[in-house]
Design a protein with these regions (language model features):
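Membrane-embedded beta-strands of outer-membrane beta-barrel proteins
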Residues: 66, 97-99, 133, 161-163, ...
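Residues that define the transmembrane beta-barrel architecture of outer-membrane proteins
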Residues: 42-44, 60-64, 91-95, 127-131, ...
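Repeated loop/turn-to-beta-strand initiation elements of outer-membrane beta-barrel proteins
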Residues: 74-79, 107-111, 141-145, 170-175, ...
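Outer-membrane beta-barrel initiation region
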Residues: 27-88, 102-103, 245
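Residue-level signature of outer-membrane beta-barrel architecture
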Residues: 70-72, 103, 137, 151, ...
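Detector for outer-membrane/organellar transmembrane beta-barrel domains
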Residues: 124, 128-188
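Outer-membrane beta-barrel "beta-signal"
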Residues: 203-204, 208-209, 213, 239-253
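Transmembrane beta-barrel strands of outer-membrane/channel proteins
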Residues: 50, 79-83, 113-117, 147-151, ...
C-alpha cells in the first residue's frame, strides 16, 4: 500500500513538471515573440566634431568635420563630410563626402567600405571619386584611430590616418590632441598632390561641455606639406607650413 502511494506521488510530480515545461518550451518556440535581449534595435547619431573659424597665417577659413550613422550594434551606414572655405580672396574651397557600410569585426573595431567624393572650387574647379576601405576603432590606451585606403576613379592610390585622444581635466573640461597624415602613391597635379607623404596636421583643442551634446572650444593647429605636394604649393604661391588659432563648436544629437 505504501509502495502504491509513493508511485502515485511520483507520477503526480512528473505530470506537474511536464505541465510547467510545456508552456516554457512553447514560449521559446513561439514565432513572432520579441528577442530576450533587445540587440536588434536601430540607433542613430549625428556628430559635428568640428565647426570652426581658423585664423591662419595666410587666408582665414571656415572649416568643418562631421559624421552621422544609423544602424544596430553590428551593421551601420555612415556618412562623413569635411571641408574648408576661404573667407576672403578668391573664395576658394574644398570639401569631401563619404558614404560607408560599417561592420563590427572585433570589440571596439569596425571594418568600413564605401565611396568618397572630392570637390575643389574657386579659381580651380575639379572633382573626383574614390572607393574606400578602412577601419575605425580604439587602439590601446583609448586612442581613437581611423586608417583608410582610397582608390580613385583613375586608379590613383592614397591613404589617410586620423588619430585623437581625450584627456579629461574634469567631467566637462576636455583637452583633445589630434593627428592626421595623408599620403599618395601617385602625383595628381590638379589636386595639388604629390607622391609620398603629402601633409601632416597636428591639432590641440580645449572644449567645455555646457551640455554633453554642446561644447564650444578653442585651440591651435599646425600643418606642414612635404615633397612634391610642397613643391606644387610653392609654385602656386601658397605656404607649405601653417599655424592657426581655431575657435568653434562641437555638438551632437
Amino acid at each position: 500500500m505504501k509502495s502504491n502511494n509513493v508511485s502515485k506521488t511520483l507520477r503526480t510530480c512528473a505530470m506537474g513538471l511536464c505541465g510547467l515545461a510545456a508552456p516554457l518550451s512553447g514560449m521559446a518556440a513561439e514565432p513572432g515573440w520579441p528577442e530576450p535581449v533587445e540587440d536588434r534595435q536601430i540607433f542613430s547619431m549625428v556628430l559635428v566634431d568640428q565647426l570652426e573659424y581658423r585664423g591662419n597665417q595666410g587666408t582665414d577659413t571656415l572649416e568643418w568635420d562631421a559624421q552621422a550613422w544609423i544602424g544596430g550594434d553590428y551593421n551601420r551606414l555612415w556618412l562623413r563630410t569635411e571641408g574648408a572655405d576661404q573667407l576672403s580672396g578668391d573664395n576658394d574651397g574644398e570639401w569631401e563626402a563619404q558614404a560607408l557600410y560599417s561592420r563590427l569585426v572585433a570589440p571596439f573595431w569596425d571594418f568600413q567600405a564605401g565611396l568618397r567624393y572630392d570637390r575643389l572650387y574657386g579659381a580651380q574647379d575639379h572633382e573626383r571619386g574614390f572607393a574606400v576601405i578602412g577601419f575605425e576603432g580604439l587602439a590601446p590606451y583609448w586612442f581613437e584611430v581611423t586608417p583608410a585606403l582610397f582608390i580613385s576613379q583613375d586608379g590613383d592610390l592614397s591613404a589617410r590616418l586620423k588619430a585623437s585622444y581625450e584627456l579629461l581635466f574634469t567631467q566637462r573640461l576636455i583637452l583633445q590632441p589630434s593627428l592626421e597624415i595623408n599620403a599618395a602613391a601617385q602625383k595628381v597635379e590638379e589636386f595639388g598632390v604629390g607622391s609620398g607623404i603629402n601633409d601632416i596636421e597636428l591639432g590641440l583643442r580645449l572644449r567645455y561641455e555646457i551640455k554633453r551634446e554642446f561644447a564650444p572650444y578653442i585651440g591651435v593647429s599646425w600643418t606642414n606639406k612635404f615633397g612634391g605636394t610642397a613643391d606644387m604649393a610653392r609654385s602656386e604661391g601658397e605656404r607649405t607650413e601653417d599655424f592657426a588659432v581655431v575657435a568653434g563648436l562641437r555638438f551632437w544629437f
